[in-house]
Amino acid sequence: YWQPYGWDYGQITYTVQDNVCEVQGLLRGNTWNHLATLPSDCRPSGREIFNMNNHQYTSRVDVLSNGEIHWVTGGSSHGWLSLTGIVFVTNAGPKTGLPFNNGYTNYGHSYEGPYYSKINNECILGGLIGGGNGNNHVGTLPAGCRPRQGLLFNVNNHQCTMRLHVATDGRIHRETGHCHAWTSLAGVTFPASEATKTTLQLSNGWKGYGGYWGTPYYSLIKGECIVQGLISGNKWGWIATLPDACRPHYRLIFNLNNHQYTSRVDVLPNGEIHWIAGGNHHGWLSLTG
């Protein structure tokens, strides 16, 4: 039996806008299977595999085509699970099949085929990749749907977390966490290179990684605040602050990448972004996700 965590973490919410479904919030409970069910206008065409936060652990959470949300494996501690980071194009939305490289293909079965969509200047990816020859370059996005700087996403690989690199030339690379041969694209979204971006105000000595990885930024797209970029530093706590226009109503728990590790990063209603638990290695953290 699962229910909203409440307190500072508020309710579980979903929004559907222009055929994009997004889920946010924190659940508490202890039966690790069927967590919730989304309404008919907020469902994917096929099963999607998301990477959700469970404090220092990562959890595989699947959204099924009938709207059911299931915990599958990974972290099952603390009596809570964050659903923040579930975002996908619904079964009514426009999708284009991902151009594959190196023999990769649709995983098939009941899983969503790998796709990209460009909606309101935001690129949204999803689906499950199978096959391949073992090369880490799984597919390439077209010129209209590429990031302005290199981005590192934290995607699910069953009980493991995977670092997924979306390059400025559109290449998609799986870089750590090869626990299984498949690659999930669920949860990968970013503003297209021409979208408006504002430099993020960092704190506590954290800096943009620079060079190819650029400067961390936020974008406000139709009421959705998107924070992305790679930062370097070693004071693991308060990282940055978002302006009034880009703050959540309640505290949100994100699952972000620290190479082979997952990191819990919270965004507070006052705009502060804090590292809380999990990976704190390598002197860097990706805010992308």
Task: State the predicted function of each range.
Residues 4-11, 28-113, 130-215, 220, ...:
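Extracellular jelly-roll beta-sandwich "head" domains, especially the C-terminal globular C1q domain
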Residues 20-27, 122-129, 223-231:
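Short, well-ordered beta-strand segments enriched in hydrophobic/aromatic residues
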